[in-house]
């Protein structure tokens, strides 16, 4: 229920009052509220909260005004004080004037105090703050700050869970300490206790972490920083007089000479970093680097500032009775000042007695006298775990295209161990390499017609300078930040040369001795490859990486960046699971919205392709299409992916079972085709195209064929061959005379189809002109060639082509059934076609998932897909600066409406939010109007962003007058109502003259105008008339995994099993129940056992009396299975 008081629906946008009028009306309304009204009680509680926080008047007024504005437009569910705390935090982080420096960010009000006074936990605050940012439409920099704040909290929460068991491993339990006696003024300097060391070590760690902004939200480096703190404190504890009461004697890292004895300890403390790393999931090399370059210099500065007292030369003595009290107090005070100045979370809350209430997390295990957890602690531990699972800060969500193949992380795997494993795999990959080409790569580059070695080196040098300039370090630690940047780029160079060598080798295996100078001189390829390497290095050190920052600083268009992702994954075997999933996420982001930006090269490629977007059937392999008549492509089921298996090669989208695409295809321009399948009725052929209209039929590749003799050919179908029949073909000669030719076609041995003219009628006389006409291929009829020149004549196909399969019994297969030839290839392989193949595959997977959750039938799903494909092909600019999911949700809604199977936008968006890529901004911030580039496409695309006066009866019935705040949750909650977007109340922070609104506004004003006419053709009213054919749906086929090494220490691999479609034998044995004799069963058993067909004739005997090798019976020591596999291999080799 709403707790914001009696609220009336907001007025329509056109009648909205100005901000000044709203403030005046609001003030008058506040003065008119009776003392006992809910609004008055809320304001009274707000005033009390501000008084407790000593809030300044400007922040108080701004927070109250913002809260009133939100409560008028949204239903703010839950405790009103929690929403007021969000408004106060936003107001406190605004710039305020100062006496000396002009302005400063923040008013030094602690976030922790705001949450304590409003009785709100941190987890609740982050959940509500995300909704508040959406409702208020806060600028991106504020959202980034909140995300960084949440990430810092998440990192600290995870590290604190690791801190407790590590501390218990090296120090004694607090309950083992002797109870402290009451100390007088003269007895203050007593030895420190384990509990005090526990608090001191944590405060020292979080203070150091906060002063390293480049690693403060880095889980791996922050964890290593904690190990450095424990190493320092442990070494100091060994030198304390009461070290027997502090150090755990069972600690495995304690050597014999360091055991606590009565004798005086050594002056130099021991280093236990290596032992801590081996016992607690650390990386020794990384931890020692952090200790030498970050930790030690920082601790020396603390000694110089007198925050730590002791021996500065060896960083000891601060645990001595005379120094510990003052050192602890000074570090605590310095940390408090940092928290107030930076506005960050006070991470000492993890140590407090009320940690469950303040954080929503587990209590300190060191304060528990018993080893068992209470019900409250178990509940709070579960709350924290749910937040960590829901937060995407420290884990990579499996993309929807891979959730059925890869099992989620095991619950016993911690974020620290996962991050450490990713970094460890990176070090293993790069071990023994240098940031320069290997001797083998140098030879390969020199063998090119134009040696690109120097150009590659110059490009890397330029990109390093760019990377160093954009790496913005903190001024106090510029040297450390620069060293991190140098280290990351050096790792990226090593990985770049390693992957480049693998890519070139793979290309040479596919293309033979073809010169690769053209591809290796492609600047976009090299920049994309190095940017991808840098992203992998950045992600391994600090999830979730730096994308799209890396691509932007190098000016790499996203449309070019995506091309290298699959190449990178295929070329590098050592990538860990998390890195592959991260690259998959990047690829999906590019495909669903980043590549569709206004200035993307994608629009240039479409314009080069005659402003034409290829259809799904044109770019997808036929075996990956689900036919509209529900007949699936025949063939044996491919090997399913095993649970928990690393599927690096399946990380991309739309992986087909055909051979991988070459680099040349990925970076080539689209091939212009003048022939086009007219899928939609309003799709008229362009000038110069053939007049033939080819229905959606599976096609085979064209192959060169020989001329037909100059006589009339009679085609006799042969069992096992494919007969292609066509009614007529019209030939226009050079003199303009029209010739009508009946033709027939036979599938040849190479997988092509040869067409033969049967008879030519010229002026009523039959003439044989086949000698002057070459046989035609199916590719010519499909339109993949610009034109078909046939010895001075032009062939035009006025009628459809029927492809029929000739069965052994002489019966023909029904027209329209899919072919099972293993030689079927996609029609188009240009870079544009590859892009749309992945887009269609991604959209198909997401749409299928939504339809399952919305309980949509397969018939309606195919209609929705046809509508979506229509919007992509005919209304392409609908995607400009928009999101693929927006068009999918609109297509679901409009097709459900016209077919009377209504699905509300509320339910559609509710199901959408369950997908891993879902973000509330997708349906809350949709482009309505803005400066748009006209790509010169059809007239219907040029004015699609203009507002239209349409009846809103279809969508308005699904919308409620007040938006519920829970609609912004990334994951639906049981208590949340379905989302009903309305207008955004905050000031727009987008580009100037750009108007944005919610998804329903986009549907009413723009989408419906473009789609309505086409969608109505599938309505029940038009069911009796001819409706457009349904587009084939992408069929998800799982491929076999690639060769994967199980262990870096042992050469054990899992290799893929080639499970392609088995060719049907020419001789078959049929058994009919209650009809065939028993002899037929014995023949079948004999064929399976021996691998020979009983009806085969004996092979011709050779001179030595043996049979032909092809007819020889399998030896007894070989199984029939091996024989059959060998036959299959021979058949494939001959193709």
Swiss-Prot record:
Q: Does the keyword Transcription regulation apply?
A: yes
Q: From start to end residue, where is composition biased (Polar residues)?
A: 661-674, 683-692, 935-950, 958-969
Q: Where is this region: Spacer?
A: 614-824
Residue positions the entry lists as glycosylated? 417
Q: Which residues carry this modification: Phosphothreonine?
A: 414, 639, 968, 980
Q: PTM details?
A: During G0 and early G1 phase of the cell cycle, phosphorylated on Ser-636 and on 5 sites within the domain B. Phosphorylation on Ser-669 in G1 leads to its ubiquitin-dependent proteolysis.
Q: Which CDD domains does this UniProt record tie to the protein?
A: CYCLIN_RBL2, CYCLIN_SF
Q: Where is the composition biased (Pro residues)?
A: 971-981
What InterPro entries does UniProt report for this protein, alphabetically? Cyclin-like_dom, Cyclin-like_sf, RB_A, RB_B, RB_C, RB_fam, RB_N
UniProt subcellular location: Nucleus
Tell me the residues on which Phosphoserine occurs: 410, 636, 659, 669, 684, 942, 946, 960, 965, 967, 975-976, 1031, 1064, 1076, 1108
Please give the biological process terms from Gene Ontology that the record holds: chromatin organization; negative regulation of gene expression; regulation of cell cycle; regulation of transcription by RNA polymerase II
Q: Which Pfam families match?
A: DUF3452 (PF11934), RB_A (PF01858), RB_B (PF01857)
Similarity remark = Belongs to the retinoblastoma protein (RB) family.
Q: Which PANTHER family match?
A: RETINOBLASTOMA-ASSOCIATED PROTEIN RB -RELATED, RETINOBLASTOMA-LIKE PROTEIN 2
User: What is the documented function of this protein?
Assistant: Key regulator of entry into cell division. Directly involved in heterochromatin formation by maintaining overall chromatin structure and, in particular, that of constitutive heterochromatin by stabilizing histone methylation. Recruits and targets histone methyltransferases KMT5B and KMT5C, leading to epigenetic transcriptional repression. Controls histone H4 'Lys-20' trimethylation. Probably acts as a transcription repressor by recruiting chromatin-modifying enzymes to promoters. Potent inhibitor of E2F-mediated trans-activation, associates preferentially with E2F5. Binds to cyclins A and E.
What assembly does the database describe for this protein? Interacts with AATF and RINT1. Component of the DREAM complex (also named LINC complex) at least composed of E2F4, E2F5, LIN9, LIN37, LIN52, LIN54, MYBL1, MYBL2, RBL1, RBL2, RBBP4, TFDP1 and TFDP2. The complex exists in quiescent cells where it represses cell cycle-dependent genes. It dissociates in S phase when LIN9, LIN37, LIN52 and LIN54 form a subcomplex that binds to MYBL2. Interacts with USP4. Interacts with KMT5B, KMT5C and USP4. Interacts with PML. Interacts with RBBP9. Interacts with CD53.
Name the chain's protein: Retinoblastoma-like protein 2
Give the source species: Mus musculus
Taxonomy of the source species: Eukaryota, Metazoa, Chordata, Craniata, Vertebrata
């Amino acid at each position: 229920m709403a707790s914001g008081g009696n609220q009336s629906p907001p007025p329509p946008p056109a009648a909205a009052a100005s901000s000044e009028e709203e403030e005046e009306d609001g003030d008058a309304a506040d003065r008119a509220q009776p003392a006992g009204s809910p609004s008055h009680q809320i304001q009274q509680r707000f005033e009390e909260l501000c008084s407790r926080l000593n809030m300044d008047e400007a922040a108080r007024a701004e927070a109250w005004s913002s809260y009133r504005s939100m409560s008028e437009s949204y239903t703010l569910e839950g405790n009103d004080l929690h929403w007021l705390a969000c408004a106060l935090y936003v107001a406190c982080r605004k710039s305020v004037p100062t006496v000396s420096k002009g302005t400063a960010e923040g008013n030094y009000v602690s976030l922790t105090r705001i949450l304590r006074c409003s009785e709100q936990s941190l987890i609740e605050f982050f959940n509500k703050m995300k909704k508040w940012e959406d409702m208020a439409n806060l600028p991106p920099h504020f959202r980034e700050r909140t995300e960084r704040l949440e990430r810092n909290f998440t990192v600290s929460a995870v590290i604190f869970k690791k801190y407790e068991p590590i501390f218990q491993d090296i120090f004694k339990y607090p309950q083992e300490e002797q109870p402290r006696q009451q100390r007088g003024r003269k007895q203050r300097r007593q030895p420190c206790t384990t509990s005090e060391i526990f608090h001191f070590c944590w405060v020292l760690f979080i203070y150091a972490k906060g002063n390293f902004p480049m690693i403060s939200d880095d889980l791996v480096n922050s964890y290593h920083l904690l190990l450095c703190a424990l190493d320092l404190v442990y070494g100091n504890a060994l030198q304390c007089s009461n070290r027997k009461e502090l150090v755990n004697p069972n600690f495995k890292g304690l050597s014999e000479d360091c055991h606590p004895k009565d004798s005086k300890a050594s002056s130099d403390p021991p280093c236990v970093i290596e032992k801590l790393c081996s016992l607690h999931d650390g990386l020794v090399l990384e931890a020692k680097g952090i200790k030498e370059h970050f930790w030690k210099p920082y601790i020396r500065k603390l000694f110089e500032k007198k925050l730590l007292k002791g021996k500065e030369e060896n960083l000891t003595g601060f645990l001595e009775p005379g120094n510990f009290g003052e050192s602890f107090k000074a570090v605590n005070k310095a940390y408090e000042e940092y928290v107030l100045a930076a506005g960050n979370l006070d991470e000492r809350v993890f140590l407090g007695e009320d940690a469950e209430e303040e954080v929503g997390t587990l209590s300190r295990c060191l304060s528990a006298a018993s080893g068992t957890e209470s019900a409250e602690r178990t509940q709070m531990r579960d709350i924290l775990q749910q937040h960590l699972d829901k937060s995407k800060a420290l884990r990579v969500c499996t993309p929807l295209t891979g959730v059925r193949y890869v099992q989620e992380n095991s619950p016993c795997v911690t974020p620290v161990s996962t991050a450490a494993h990713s970094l460890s795999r990176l070090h293993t990959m790069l071990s023994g390499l240098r940031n320069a080409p290997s001797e083998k790569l140098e030879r390969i580059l020199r063998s090119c017609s134009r040696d690109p070695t120097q150009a590659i080196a110059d490009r890397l040098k330029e990109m390093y300078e760019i990377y160093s300039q954009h790496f913005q370090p903190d001024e106090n630690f510029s040297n450390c930040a620069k060293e991190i940047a140098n280290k990351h780029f050096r790792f990226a160079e090593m990985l770049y040369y390693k992957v480049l060598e693998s890519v070139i080798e793979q290309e040479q295996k596919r293309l033979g001795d073809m010169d690769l100078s053209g591809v290796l001189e492609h600047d976009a390829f090299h920049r994309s490859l190095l940017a991808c390497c840098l992203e992998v290095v950045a992600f391994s050190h600090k999830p979730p990486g730096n994308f799209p920052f890396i691509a932007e600083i190098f000016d790499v268009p996203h449309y070019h960046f995506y091309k290298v992702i699959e190449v990178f994954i295929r070329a590098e075997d050592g990538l860990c699971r998390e890195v592959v999933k991260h690259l998959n996420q990047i690829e999906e982001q590019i495909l669903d919205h980043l590549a569709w930006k206004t200035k993307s090269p994608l629009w240039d490629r479409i314009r080069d392709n005659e402003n034409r977007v290829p259809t799904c059937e044109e770019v997808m392999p036929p075996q990956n299409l689900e036919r509209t008549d529900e007949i699936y492509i025949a063939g044996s089921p491919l090997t399913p992916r095993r649970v928990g298996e690393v599927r690096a090669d399946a990380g991309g989208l739309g992986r087909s079972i055909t051979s991988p695409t070459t680099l040349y295809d990925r970076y080539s321009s689209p091939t212009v085709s003048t022939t086009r399948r007219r899928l939609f009725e309003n799709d008229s052929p362009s000038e110069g195209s053939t007049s033939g209209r080819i229905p959606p039929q599976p096609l085979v590749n064209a192959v060169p064929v020989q001329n037909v003799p100059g006589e009339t050919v009679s085609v006799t179908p042969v069992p096992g061959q494919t007969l292609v029949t066509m009614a007529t073909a019209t030939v226009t000669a050079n003199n303009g005379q029209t010739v009508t030719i009946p033709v027939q076609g036979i599938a040849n041995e190479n997988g092509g189809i040869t067409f033969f003219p049967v008879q030519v009628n010229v002026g009523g006389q039959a003439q044989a002109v086949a000698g002057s006409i070459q046989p035609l291929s199916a590719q010519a009829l499909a339109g993949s060639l610009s034109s078909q020149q046939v010895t001075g004549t032009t062939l035009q196909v006025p009628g459809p082509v029927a492809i029929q399969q000739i069965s052994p019994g002489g019966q023909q297969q029904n027209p329209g059934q899919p072919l099972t030839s293993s030689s079927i290839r996609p029609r188009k392989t240009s870079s544009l076609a590859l892009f749309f193949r992945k887009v269609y595959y991604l959209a198909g997977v997401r749409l299928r998932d939504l339809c399952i959750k919305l309980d949509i039938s397969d018939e309606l799903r195919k209609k929705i897909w046809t509508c979506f494909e229509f919007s992509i092909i005919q209304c392409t600019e609908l995607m400009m600066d928009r999101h693929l999911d927006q068009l999918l949700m609109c297509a679901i809604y409009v097709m459900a409406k016209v077919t009377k199977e209504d699905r509300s936008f509320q339910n559609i968006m509710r199901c959408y939010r369950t997908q891993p890529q879902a973000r509330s901004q997708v349906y809350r911030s949709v482009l309505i109007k803005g400066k748009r580039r006209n790509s010169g496409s059809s007239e219907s695309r040029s004015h699609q962003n203009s507002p239209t006066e349409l009846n809103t009866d279809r969508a308005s019935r699904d919308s409620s007058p007040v938006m519920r705040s829970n609609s912004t949750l990334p994951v639906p909650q049981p208590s949340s109502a379905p989302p009903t977007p309305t207008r955004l109340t905050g000031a727009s922070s987008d580009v100037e003259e750009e108007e944005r609104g919610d998804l329903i506004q986009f549907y009413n004003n723009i989408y419906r105008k473009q789609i309505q006419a086409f969608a109505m053709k599938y309505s029940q009213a038009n069911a009796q008339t001819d409706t457009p054919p349904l587009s084939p749906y992408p069929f998800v086929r799982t491929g076999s995994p690639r060769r994967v090494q199980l262990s870096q220490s042992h050469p054990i691999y899992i290799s893929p099993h080639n499970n392609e479609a088995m060719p049907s034998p020419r001789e078959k044995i049929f058994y009919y129940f209650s009809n065939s004799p028993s002899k037929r069963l014995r023949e079948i058993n004999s064929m399976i056992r021996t691998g020979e067909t009983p009806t085969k004739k004996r092979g011709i005997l050779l001179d030595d009396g043996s049979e032909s090798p092809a007819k020889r019976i399998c030896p007894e020591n070989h199984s029939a299975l091996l024989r059959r596999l060998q036959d299959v291999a021979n058949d494939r080799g001959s193709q």
